[in-house]
Curated annotation (Swiss-Prot):
The keyword Disulfide bond applies. Glycans are attached at residues 53, 118, 134, 204, 258, 270, 297, 302, 334, 359, 369, 435. It comes from the Eukaryota. Hydrolysis of 1,4-alpha-D-galactosiduronic linkages in pectate and other galacturonans. It comes from Cochliobolus carbonum (Maize leaf spot fungus). The keyword Iron does not apply. GO terms for molecular function: galacturan 1,4-alpha-galacturonidase activity; polygalacturonase activity. Disulfide bonds join 252-269, 397-403, 424-436. One of its GO terms (cellular component) is extracellular region. This is Exopolygalacturonase. It is found in: Secreted. Its EC number is 3.2.1.67. InterPro entries: Glyco_hydro_28 (IPR000743), PbH1 (IPR006626), Pectin_lyas_fold (IPR012334), Pectin_lyase_fold/virulence (IPR011050).
Length: 446
């Protein structure tokens, strides 16, 4: 079944009964938002959340004092059917790594601001180590039947990290929001600000919805905020990311290894590296699968890419000291990008099996062990930047044996000079679909 087949997914929210007198504390608990049924999702419907029958109202200590212990206590008290409120107008400080992977039937109603401390030494030593690309997280949130919402802000206090990374690219920079081992979780109506690295990691999770998330964070110094992906999914299934605004400096969304049955829709992305499959095939001996992905109705501005698939070649290569790899195996299959408006992007479409390898002759000698097949990219409109003018796209496979059934249709994208050329190689049938030029020397950027 193709990913574009409509499969209804009823996303029902809990009705919450509040039992504590929260009004006397000068704050108000808010019931979790309801989501309408969502078409297009190629996965299973979410299960019905349970009821909520108790409320824990937090009060910030203030003055930069660590609220972590009080937060942990409230979460434990209101777990299994409760509602934790971070009141509006209060700023909570987290200076201690929190393991919240025990959650069950709980609403985290973040109306105020949660800010993580900028103690880079502490966080490098104590943040939670994840298993992919040296990823770490400030906290781990997991379990089942979880709602996180409220209109508030999570602030990663990233400036100290941007400046430190400029001096040492091997530091471990925490991810702002770590959803680890979650099932039936809904995260909505929140602002994510100034993450040290990726904004969101969704790992080993299923039946998850992100909706109405506003992401923003830039650097106030000469040192840019790098690797600030909006979302990265990893070993996760049945995920929705929708109705959000993202201003960042790396992938708007990235499907990392073993991401399946994912719907991404109605996003406005600015300053990113596109909506990306990968990178994949980075680690020898690992099998990476990304399949059944639908990306639809996207606005992409001032970005390196619109739609992007990036796969490492069969031999080791390096983009930088902290990003190198190649030789892994697996497959990318049944991926559809349908509907994207692009403005000032370097490439509207980029598919490469030579990621990290600028010498394409060497890449062709050691083709990727990871296959790309059944890819549909259609209904794109807009303009590219001057960077690769006169080209607007790049489709370069390492061998026709590992790259097949790529369909590109209804692409109305022009370069500044008015052309619509693609660099093409080793992709059977692509010459009849787009205006191909000779093979270039680009092996993929970070």
């Amino acid at each position: 079944m193709r990913v574009t087949d409509i499969i209804s997914c009823a996303l029902l929210q809990a009705s919450i009964a509040l039992s504590t007198p929260v009004e006397e504390l000068g704050a108000k608990a808010v019931v979790a938002k309801r989501f309408p049924p969502v078409p297009f999702l190629p996965g299973k419907a979410s299960s019905v959340p349970g009821s909520r029958n108790k409320t824990c109202m937090l009060k910030a200590l203030g003055g930069g004092k660590d609220d972590s212990a009080n937060i942990l206590s409230a979460v434990k008290q209101c777990n299994n059917g409760g509602h934790v409120v971070f009141p509006k107008g209060q700023q909570f400080t987290i200076g201690t790594a929190l393991d919240l992977t025990f959650l069950n039937g709980i609403d985290l109603d973040i109306q105020g601001t949660i800010q993580f401390t900028n103690d880079t030494d502490y966080w490098q030593a104590n943040s939670f180590k994840q298993v992919f690309q040296n990823a770490t997280t400030f906290f781990q949130l997991g379990g089942k039947d979880i709602n996180v919402y409220g209109g508030g802000t999570l602030d990663g206090n990233g400036q100290a990290w941007y400046d430190l990374y400029a001096k040492d690219i091997y530091i471990l920079r925490p991810i702002l929001f770590g959803l680890i081992g979650a099932k039936n979780a809904k995260i909505s109506d929140l602002k994510f600000r100034y993450s040290p690295q990726w904004y969101t990691l969704v790992a080993n999770s299923s039946q998850v919805v992100f909706s109405n998330i506003d992401i923003f964070g830039d650097s106030k110094s000469k040192n840019p905020a790098k690797n600030t992906d909006g979302w990265d999914t990893y070993r996760s299934d049945n995920i929705i990311i929708q109705n959000s605004n993202i201003n960042n400096g790396d992938d708007c969304v990235s499907f990392k290894p073993n991401s399946t049955n994912i719907l991404v829709q109605n996003l406005v992305c600015n300053g990113s590296h596109g909506i990306s499959v990968g990178s994949l095939g980075q680690y020898p001996g690992e099998v990476d699968i990304v399949e059944n992905i639908l990306v639809r109705n996207i606005s992409m501005s001032n970005a390196s890419d619109g739609a992007r698939i990036k796969v490492w070649p069969g031999a080791s290569s390096a983009l930088s000291g902290d990003l190198q790899g190649g030789g892994g195996s697996g497959a990318v299959r049944n991926v559809t990008y349908d509907g994207m408006i692009v403005k000032n992007v370097d490439y509207a479409i980029e598919i490469t099996q030579c990621y990290g390898q600028k010498n394409l002759t060497l890449c062709n000698q050691f083709p990727s062990n990871l296959t790309i097949s059944d890819i549909t990219i259609k209904n794109f409109k807009g303009t590219t930047s001057k960077k690769y003018d006169p080209r607007v796209g790049y489709v370069v496979c390492s061998s026709p044996k590992v790259c097949s059934d790529i369909s590109i249709e209804n692409i109305d994208v022009k370069s500044p000079s008015g052309t619509n050329l693609f660099t093409c190689a080793n992709a059977e049938g692509i010459q009849s679909q787009v205006n191909c030029t000779v093979e270039g020397d680009k092996g993929g950027h970070s």
